[in-house]
Amino acid sequence: MLSKLLRVGEGRMVKRLKKVADYVESLSGDVEKLTDAELRAKTDEFKKRHAEGESLDELLPEAFAVAREAAWRVLGQRPFEVQLMGAAALHLGNVAEMKTGEGKTLTSVLPAYLNGIGGKGVHIVTVNDYLAKRDSEWMGRVHRFLGLDVGVILAQMTPEERRVAYNADITYGTNNEFGFDYLRDNMAHTLDDCVQRGHNFVIVDEVDSILIDEARTPLIISGPADGSSNWYTEFARLAPLMEKDTHYEVDLRKRTVGVHELGVEFVEDQLGIDNLYEAANSPLVSYLNNALKAKELFNRDKDYIVRNGEVLIVDEFTGRVLIGRRYSEGMHQAIEAKEHVEIKAENQTLATITLQNYFRLYNKHAGMTGTAQTEAAELHEIYKLGVVPIPTNRPMVREDQSDLIYKTEEAKYIAVVDDVAERYEKGQPVLIGTTSVERSEYLSRQFTKRRIPHNVLNAKYHEQEAGIIAEAGRRGAITVATNMAGRGTDIVLGGNVDFLTDKRLRDNGLDPVETPDEYEQAWHQELPKVKEEAGDEATEVIKAGGLYVLGTERHESRRIDNQLRGRSGRQGDPGESRFYLSLGDELMRRFNGAALESLLTRLNLPDDVPIEAKMVTRAIKSAQTQVEQQNFEVRKNVLKYDEVMNQQRKVIYAERRRILEGENLQQQVKDMLTDVITAYVDGATVEGYAEDWDLDALWTALKTLYPVGIKTDTLMRRDQDSDRDDLTRDELLQALLQDADQAYAAREAELEELAGEGAMRQLERNVLLNVIDRKWREHLYEMDYLKEGIGLRAMAQRDPLVEYQREGYDMFMAMLDGVKEESVGFLFNVSVEAVPAPQVEVAPVAEPEDLAEFATAAAAAAQEGGAGRKNAAAREEAPSRLRAKGIEDESPALTYSGPSEDGSAQVQRNGGGAAKTPAGVPAGRSRRERREAARRQGRGAKPPKSVKKR
């Protein structure tokens, strides 16, 4: 119903966009007369007018006309009317639904240019690093021609390179990189370590893939945790000995395993324990479940491959190998044990955010995709994004044939090879979509037997993917691809002219970024030649029927199927598509497979005779709808629970930023001191009468906090006639607060004598940042475990979400109290030493070559102390700086966990990080042990009970 309501205003929006496009078109005549220099000068004119109060909406027609003309002069491509409509929809903060081949990448240039004029930055999000780099170079040529800076964020960049890219007018990158940089900035210890400059306007390419599919998996930065691989190895030995349906059951639909009583007894016998489920053995249950999942649900060459003794995840949707990424919660270690390769340690969470809440940080969102209408309700509900279907430039003439269903997979693949051989004979290009590396290699072997030349595009050979796709529309080209979602390169009949031209120029040593002038000159010379060659070949391909897309299996998402089909029939070209299915396909087995098999049995058809039945089509659609609905529920649930964490995250990150930006913390620390001592006094004076107070215990506790300078006797008997009853709670509190203030002033004088003026402010900054980070990390553990068990509250007729919100709030307030107490204790008791300041101007830190060196550089920068740029002068005045022992240790390498390109699995990528983790955090072998370790570490971080007198 909501989807229908959202579509009511589509017609009006399209008409409005058509008027904008017509107005831009009317300005083209005047813009075409401008010289290159005059066209470039328009950017400065727009910036000036915007600074004087003219809005971007008012500048839109002229800016679009200028950017359109620049695209024609630089790329030889003039955006069509429908692309102008799409560009306007993006600027207005909508999702532009543009079919494959309609030029979404070129469309994004116009709103990016317009919003780049504002000077607050534009982020363009793509699905992978290759496309981010390609688009920043390709479309960046237009922006650079017009005088705007263009940057790109890639996985292996150093912090300095990232900062330069973010300071550009327009920045390209992937959602994971943008999100991780946000988290790293909120783990930084100086402003110099921060790279982002705010969240103004974002354009998301393949918006449904990024904001819908990948939204199921949060971004997580984690640090190394101690752990033993013995249990993984032991359970990898037991899993093959256990029998399915006897010892355990498997639910393929929900991707879960359940251990039967016989299975529990078997494991207990093998391990020599009495009760698997008693408290001491409960961590073993997780090892058992992961071992069985690794055996039944994770298949080699489909879900992962093993290369050079390492388990590498294969993206289910796109078929790419996700280098360096890992499953979480011990799943990757279980697979490593199954495959008998080195088992690497688990990690502990340091920072996390969901994609939904990251993209909500932006003032304005927009997105592009070919398949968003089915998700319009979700995009509107979560991101407040409207979906606007943009008409195609030319009518679609592709023929979508009905599915062919075979009884066995073998019969299906024989039919596929026969069909492809027939198309190859007449010179028609064919694109075959498969769902796994294993299937693509099987088909490749069959084609080789039949002597059919072909290219394979899958997880093992993805380095060549752009080149293979660019030529997939040439005469007789046969391309086998694991999946086409997010590939990002157009399949043009006769060959992709832009790609082929670029390849020739790069082969001659030219580069659009390194040698822009020579590249542009050669481009205009080479482009007409390539166009002519490709045009002649395209004519032959059209006669043969255009591109034929053949799917070998239906995907669980209809959008992925539609994206595969959409590769054919772009820009009004002829084309054809068909799916070949069998009862052995994953989707068929998970839903309604038995009913279809009984139907085929009753029909008594031979294996090699397919059926085309509406009932089967309906069953497939029903299965896909069920999966999509399940995934939607998962995403909604993730968002509901993360909203609790999001509010807490905002408080912590805002506080960190305030500290980083150099605000004077002296008053805040004094307020903390007041709160902590007040809490101590309240706890000791809870009984109503002074004679009932245990002041000795209070003094013992206070001495762990600061060097107490008054004695209980002084307070109790101020003169010979006074009585203990004369001491009130307020008098006690005021006396202790006055004493603590004097002690803090003495501590400040001591440190300034040691390291010069401003030393105490520097220590306050360092201590607060480190304590906040430590307590936040511990809080993340606690919230994680609270969420794991909160579902059981439903058995007590309580709403788990409400309980999570209530208990999460209580835990957060307790954490803030802990931050105050630990900070005060550290400020009084931490051991410090003076470090000589450098005698010369501080040179820039050498840029590390890759993320593995990221942490070392970050830690070195963090040890500079201070509050960043605003306090640079203050740092220079101090003859030396302080180093606090125990809170400025070296940073460990970090691990990044986020969604793959489809969001189907939580994975991890190793690298360095910008924040420090206190050393000596014993993480434990199991999640329960890690939790206890976090608690112990939190307790152990409190100040020593004796204070060294000076």
Curated annotation (Swiss-Prot):
Top-level enzyme category: translocase
Topological relation to the membrane, as annotated: Peripheral membrane protein
Subcellular location as annotated: Cell membrane; Cytoplasm
Main location: membrane
Basic and acidic residues bias (residue ranges): 873-888
Disordered: region residues: 864-950
Reactions catalysed, as given in the entry: ATP + H2O + cellular proteinSide 1 = ADP + phosphate + cellular proteinSide 2
Biological role stated in the UniProt entry: Part of the Sec protein translocase complex. Interacts with the SecYEG preprotein conducting channel. Has a central role in coupling the hydrolysis of ATP to the transfer of proteins into and across the cell membrane, serving as an ATP-driven molecular motor driving the stepwise translocation of polypeptide chains across the membrane.
Assembly mode: Monomer and homodimer. Part of the essential Sec protein translocation apparatus which comprises SecA, SecYEG and auxiliary proteins SecDF. Other proteins may also be involved.
Entry protein name: Protein translocase subunit SecA 1
